[in-house]
Design a protein with these regions (language model features):
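Non-catalytic cell-wall polysaccharide-engagement segments
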Residues: 1-3, 9, 51-68, 72, ...
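N-terminal carbohydrate-binding/catalytic regions of secreted carbohydrate-active enzymes
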Residues: 4-20, 24-25, 29
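Generic recognition of cysteine residues
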Residues: 14, 44-47, 77, 83
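Short, functionally critical alpha-helical segments immediately adjacent to catalytic or ligand/cofactor-binding
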Residues: 20-37, 44, 67-71, 95-101, ...
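Glycine- and aromatic-rich loop/turn segments at beta-sheet edges
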Residues: 38-47, 117-118
Length: 153
């Protein structure tokens, strides 16, 4: 499988970012984001932790840099969601959706609902679409799309 070629790199990046226990989740995220294909394997070109490439879709041309940035950004999302353990699945879901939306979902959902649901993720997506004038905003079902690939270790 294309994602598994990056397993050791994901494990190292997660260790460096202080989120070693989440490396298998990151592999599932990579499967959802790119199936391990292309160069921006974690689709994080637009992420604020990307300082080496343009902040436009698929601008990252080094898969290992994409993994590094993705791990740093996911560590930030986990912190925003208050998720300190892989076993805290409710907070993990918030962190995953925050990674996909890229901005402020964790804070918003914790203030308004306290937990992730597809319904409140859809509400947030529509709110951001309207605010930004975009035709779509993220994937409100990202959590389920990632977790179908996740195998707890």
């Amino acid at each position: 499988e294309d994602v598994l070629q990056y397993q050791s790199s994901v494990e190292k990046a997660c260790k460096d970012a202080g989120i070693s226990q989440f490396s298998t989740v990151m592999l599932a995220m990579m499967q959802q984001e790119s199936s391990g294909l292309g160069t921006d394997v974690l689709q994080c070109s637009e992420c604020p932790f990307n300082t080496n490439y343009d902040n436009t879709p698929n601008a990252i041309t080094d898969p290992y840099y994409s993994i590094q940035v993705g791990a740093e950004y996911f560590a930030y999302c986990l912190k925003e969601a208050g998720c300190r353990s892989i076993k805290n699945t409710e907070r993990l879901k918030i962190a995953l959706q925050d990674y996909n939306f890229g901005n402020s979902y964790a804070t918003w959902v914790l203030e308004n609902y306290g937990t992730y649901t597809v319904e409140n993720a859809t509400e947030f997506s529509l709110m951001m679409q309207n605010t930004l004038g975009w035709s779509s905003y993220g994937d409100p079902e990202y959590v389920d799309h990632v977790l179908r690939y996740y195998i707890a270790s």
